A protein has these predicted regions:
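FabD-like malonyl-/acyl-CoA
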Residues: 1-111
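Alpha/beta catalytic cores of group-transfer enzymes, especially the acyltransferase/condensing modules
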Residues: 5-7, 68-182
Length: 187
């Protein structure tokens, strides 16, 4: 497919035939999620369901922008593949984790994160009222989870991720991605 050629990887093979360890590497997960998102949008269009507007969170922004024809498949394939590589390769070494805190006010979750003394935990995504994703290292997320439950969270769900996404730990990856996309726009 066009997306696979642009990314330099057989996305269908990666998604359906690779081992979990390979697919869960950020450099592979990013492009696989993009392909699935775009595939779902294509299926909806085939059923005559077309959005007037599209938006996305984090990686979802790339699918939304492609759906809106702001990116070509060639461009988004290259960009998202590089983005995943930057995220994986420029993340500092660490034992990272994320969790979703459910049933607690945003401000309370922020207070809970400030109480963490073993490692770090910070609110990463305010997903919807009553649900916030928190990123950090495993020790910080474990401590945050215990405090959140003690202070009234309905649930804390561990998220299967390889990094503390949406935190300052990915600043270098963000800078590299910005430079890459700026250079691509100049070409």
């Amino acid at each position: 497919s066009t997306l696979s050629k642009a990314a330099g990887i057989d996305i269908a093979d990666l998604t359906f035939n690779s081992q979990e360890e390979e697919l869960s590497q950020t450099k592979n997960t990013q492009i696989a999620i993009l392909a699935m998102s775009l595939g779902i949008l294509k299926l909806l269009e085939e059923k005559n369901i077309k959005a007037d507007y599209a938006t996305g969170l984090s990686l979802g922004e790339y699918a939304a922008l492609t759906y809106a024809k702001s990116f070509t498949l060639e461009d988004v394939g290259k960009i998202v593949k590089k983005r995943g590589e930057f995220m994986q390769n420029l993340l500092p070494e660490g034992d990272w984790a994320m969790a979703a805190v459910i049933g607690m006010e945003d401000e309370k979750i922020e207070e809970v994160c400030k109480k963490v003394v073993q490692g770090f935990a910070v609110p990463a995504n305010y997903n919807c009222p009553g649900q916030v994703a928190v990123s950090g290292d495993k020790a910080g997320i474990l401590e945050m989870s215990e405090i959140a439950k003690e202070e009234g969270a309905k649930r804390v769900v561990s998220l299967k991720t390889s990094g503390p996404f949406h935190t300052e730990k990915l600043v270098e990856a963000s800078k590299a991605c910005l430079l890459y996309t700026s250079d691509a726009a100049d070409d």
